[in-house]
């Protein structure tokens, strides 16, 4: 049973680690989404400025190309990250299932040990009762 307790403890630790990893990945995905939103906002703001000024319009094309390339890179990174998050969630779910099976097995072993202990105690009490009954019966005959 000690090895099962150790397995449960190990799997709980693995679940904690997987949960932390998933939280880190989610936080990174949120940062990527925010950066993409910021780029879109900057592009819109610069487009408005480019419409107002000839000098700004000349540099807007280069700015737009750089920011658009940066946005595409972030979007690709976000797509890759979303796949990694999906894998991490699957691994976490599998770890939970495995932990649950170990916990169920441990619980069954504990219940079995408790039943066996109860049987041993009952056998001792039965033996004591028989001894007392014999002594009482023998005393009554004497």
What are these regions (language model features)?
Residues 1-142:
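Charge-rich amphipathic alpha-helical interaction elements
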């Amino acid at each position: 049973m000690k090895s099962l307790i150790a397995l449960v403890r190990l799997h709980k630790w693995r679940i904690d680690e997987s949960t932390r990893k998933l939280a880190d990945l989610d936080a990174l995905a949120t940062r990527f989404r925010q950066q993409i939103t910021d780029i879109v906002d900057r592009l819109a703001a610069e487009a408005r400025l480019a419409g107002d000024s000839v000098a700004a319009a000349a540099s807007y094309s280069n700015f737009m190309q750089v920011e658009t390339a940066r946005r595409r890179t972030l979007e690709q990174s976000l797509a890759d990250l979303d796949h990694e998050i999906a894998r991490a969630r699957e691994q976490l779910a599998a770890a939970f299932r495995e932990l649950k099976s170990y916990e169920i097995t441990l619980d069954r072993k504990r219940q079995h040990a408790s039943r066996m202990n109860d049987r041993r105690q009952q056998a001792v009490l039965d033996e004591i009762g028989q001894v007392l009954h014999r002594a009482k019966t023998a005393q009554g005959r004497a």
